Amino acid sequence: MKESVQRKLESLTERFEEVQALVSQPEIIADQDKYRALTKEYSQLEGVVKCFADYQGAQGDFESAQEMMQESDPEMREMAQEEYKSSKQAIEQYEDELQILLLPKDPNDESNCFIEIRAGAGGDEAAIFAGDLFRMYSRYAEARRWKVEVVTMNEGDHGGYKEVIANIIGDGAYGVLKFESGGHRVQRVPETESQGRIHTSACTVVVMPEVPESEAIEVNKADLKIDTFRASGAGGQHVNKTDSAIRITHVPSGIVVECQDERSQHKNRAKAMAVLQSRLNKLEEEKRQAEETSTRRNLVASGDRSERIRTYNFPQGRVTDHRINLTLYRLDDVVAGDLDAVLEPIRQEHQADLLASLSDEG
C-alpha cells in the first residue's frame, strides 16, 4: 500500500474515533443539526475504518507467519506457510476494497431523486413504453422499500404517458438511479400491428437529485410566471372542480414545471418548486461538467434524447446497454423491475473509470 494512502487511512481512523466520542456528548445530542451532521459523518467513515482495521489485522498475521516460517519445527513451518498464503490473499482483497471505498463520492448520491420520463418518437407506442418504464422503476423502488410519489402525469391517448414525473424517496435513490438518464429505445410489434412488423419507439429519462431546502438555489420571484388551471381527471372521475393545478415557468432558463397530482394548490406549488429547484441544479451541474477539461467518459448521461443509452428488444427478449456494451437476454425480468442486473455492471464500470482517472492523476 502507498504511504500516502496509509496516511490518509490513519487520519480517517483518528477522525472516526473523534466523531465516535462526540456523538455521545449530551451537548451535541441536544443540538439536532450538529448531531445529525456527525451521525452522517460517522456512517460515512464506518465502512472504510472497519475495512482498514481488517487490513491491519491481516498485515499483522502476515508478518507473524513470516517469522514462524523461520522456525526449525517442520509442523510449525507448514502451519506458517498456510497462514502466509491466506493472510497475503486477505491483504490483497482488503486493498481492493479500500481502493473503492476511498473513491471520491458524489455528494448527491444519498439524496432522494426526481425521475422524469417523456415519450419521444413513436407516438402512441412511445407513450405506452413510457408507462412500461415508469412501472419498471416503481417496482424497483418498491423492492428497495423506497416511496414513489407522482408529481405530474400526462396520460397517452391509448395508455401509458406522454410525460410522467415522480419523486423517489429513499436512502441513496439518486446514487443508484442516476445512471438511467438518457435515451431509452424499444423495439417490438405493437398490438395494433396486423402485419407483425417491429416498430421502434423512444423515451427520454432524466434523473435529478432532490435539492434540500438548505441548499436551494435562490430564485427571484420576478423570474417566475405562475399559472393555475383545472386538473384533468381520467375518464371524468375525481375531476378537480377548482383551479388547483400549477404551472411554473422560470423565465430566464425557459424551464416549465406542471403539477396537478394533489387536490391542494399549495401542495402542487410546493411539489412544482421542488422539481424546478432540481432542474436548475442540474443546469448548474451540466455547466460545471462542460467547463471541466477531463476527457474521462461520463456514464451519467444528461438525459438528452440524442444520448441513446439502452435498447429493449422484445422479439429477442434482449436488453442492451450501449455505454458498456452489455447485452442480457433477460428482458422480462428487467422490465418487471429487476434492474440490478443492468445497474450493477454499470456501477462497477463507473468505479473502474474513477480508479483509472485517479491512477492517471497519480
UniProtKB/Swiss-Prot annotation:
Q: Which Gene3D superfamilies match?
A: 3.30.160.20, 3.30.70.1660, 6.10.140.1950
Sorted keywords for this record are: Cytoplasm, Methylation, Protein biosynthesis
Task: Give yes or no: UniProt keyword Cell cycle.
Answer: no
Name assigned to this protein: Peptide chain release factor 1
**Basic and acidic residues bias (residue ranges):** 284-295
Q: Please give the HAMAP family that the UniProt record associates with this protein.
A: Rel_fac_1
Family label: Belongs to the prokaryotic/mitochondrial release factor family.
Its post-translational modification remark reads:
Methylated by PrmC. Methylation increases the termination efficiency of RF1.
Per UniProt, what is the name of the gene that codes for the protein in this document?
Answer: prfA
- Ranges for the region named Disordered are 284-304
Q: Where does it reside?
A: Cytoplasm
Q: Which PROSITE patterns match?
A: RF_PROK_I
What NCBIfam families has UniProt attached to this entry? prfA, PRK00591.1
| Classification via InterPro entries | PCRF (IPR005139), Pep_chain_release_fac_I (IPR000352), Pep_chain_release_fac_I_sf (IPR045853), Prokaryotic/Mito_RF (IPR050057), RF-1 (IPR004373)
Which Pfam families is this protein grouped with? PCRF, RF-1
Q: From the UniProt record, which GO molecular function terms apply?
A: translation release factor activity, codon specific
Entry annotated with the keyword Coiled coil: no
- In UniProt terms, what function does this protein have? Peptide chain release factor 1 directs the termination of translation in response to the peptide chain termination codons UAG and UAA.
GO CC, sorted alphabetically, is: cytoplasm
